C-alpha cells in the first residue's frame, strides 16, 4: 500500500514537471539571431534607418552590416564569408553569384535604382559645370572600375563622352564610392563621380552634372538571400522587409529610385 502511494506521488510529480516544461517551451522567447548583411557602401545611410525599424518589429534579430564595394563583397562571399544576404550596387556581380549557386534566384529581386553624378567641392576655385570641364582639373576621383560598380559606370560614361583618354592620367582611384566622396569633401581632388544618393548625403559637395542614362549600363541594386545562410528564415524576413512600403519610402528619401521587381 505504501509502495503504491509512493508510485502515485511520483507520477503526480512527473506530470507536474512535464507540464511546467511544456509551458516553458511555449513561453520561451525566440532565440537571438545575428544576421549579417553585405551591402554596397552607397546603401549605408538608408539601410541604417531600415535596420532600426526592422529590429523593433523583430527584437530577436540583430542586423549587422558589412559595407563595401560590391565587387569586393562578391569575392568575400565566393571565398566562404559568413553572409546571410547580399545587397549589391551592380547586377553583374550579383548575377555571377546566382550563376555560381551562392544565391537562390527565387529569393532575389531588383530593389532600387540610382543615378551617377559629377560632384565638386562647394568651395571649389575651379569652374566645373559638367563633364566637358574635366580637362580643367588636375585630379578627378572614381572608384576602381574592376571592383567598384560606380567606378565602372564612371569609366563607361567618360568613354562614351570621349573624355576618358584626356583625363585618364589625372584619375585617383578609390576603394569604394564613399572614399571618392571623402576625397572631394576634403578638396583632395577637383571632382569625383559618385551616386546621386551619396552626393545628396553631403553638405560639402555640389552636383555639377548628372550622367545621362544612355552613357552607362543601368544602375540597379539587386538583393538576395545566400543559399548557405545559417539563418535563412530570418534572412528571408529581412529580404521581404526591404521591399515593403515603409522600407521603399526610406530608400526613396535618400534618393534611390523604386523598382521592386523580382529577378
Question: For the regions a protein language model found, what residue spans apply to each?
Answer:
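Conserved strand-loop elements at the edges of beta-sheets that form or border functional pockets
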Residues: 67
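Periplasmic-binding protein-like
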Residues: 84-88
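Exported/periplasmic ABC-transporter solute-binding proteins
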Residues: 20-52, 71, 75-78, 90-91, ...
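Short, high-confidence coil segments that cap the C-terminus of an alpha-helix
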Residues: 60, 82-83, 189
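Signal peptide-proximal N-terminal region
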Residues: 52-64
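A short, gly/pro- and small-residue-rich
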Residues: 100-107
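Sec-dependent N-terminal signal peptides of Gram-positive bacterial secreted proteins and lipoproteins
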Residues: 1-26
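Conserved beta-strand core positions
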Residues: 35, 61-63, 116
Amino acid at each position: 500500500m505504501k509502495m503504491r502511494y509512493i508510485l502515485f506521488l511520483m507520477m503526480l510529480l512527473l506530470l507536474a514537471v512535464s507540464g511546467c516544461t511544456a509551458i516553458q517551451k511555449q513561453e520561451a522567447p525566440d532565440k537571438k539571431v545575428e544576421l549579417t548583411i553585405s551591402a554596397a557602401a552607397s546603401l549605408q545611410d538608408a539601410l541604417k534607418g531600415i535596420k532600426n525599424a526592422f529590429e523593433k518589429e523583430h527584437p530577436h534579430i540583430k542586423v549587422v552590416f558589412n559595407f563595401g564595394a560590391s565587387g569586393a563583397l562578391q569575392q568575400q562571399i565566393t571565398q566562404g564569408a559568413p553572409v546571410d544576404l547580399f545587397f549589391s550596387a551592380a547586377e553583374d556581380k550579383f548575377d555571377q553569384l546566382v550563376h555560381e549557386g551562392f544565391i537562390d534566384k527565387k529569393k532575389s529581386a531588383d530593389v532600387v535604382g540610382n543615378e551617377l553624378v559629377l560632384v565638386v567641392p562647394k568651395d571649389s576655385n575651379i569652374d566645373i559645370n559638367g563633364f566637358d570641364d574635366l580637362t580643367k582639373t588636375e585630379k578627378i576621383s572614381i572608384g576602381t572600375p574592376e571592383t567598384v560598380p560606380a567606378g565602372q559606370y564612371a569609366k563607361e560614361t567618360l568613354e562614351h563622352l570621349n573624355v576618358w583618354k584626356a583625363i585618364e592620367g589625372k584619375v585617383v582611384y578609390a576603394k569604394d564610392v564613399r572614399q571618392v566622396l571623402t576625397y572631394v569633401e576634403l578638396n583632395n581632388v577637383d571632382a569625383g563621380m559618385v551616386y546621386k544618393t551619396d552626393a545628396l548625403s553631403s553638405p560639402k559637395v555640389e552636383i555639377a552634372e548628372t550622367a545621362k542614362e544612355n552613357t552607362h549600363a543601368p544602375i540597379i541594386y539587386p538583393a538576395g538571400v545566400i543559399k548557405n545562410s545559417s539563418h535563412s528564415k530570418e534572412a528571408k524576413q529581412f529580404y521581404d522587409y526591404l521591399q515593403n512600403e515603409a522600407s521603399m519610402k526610406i530608400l526613396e528619401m535618400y534618393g534611390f529610385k523604386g523598382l521592386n521587381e523580382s529577378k
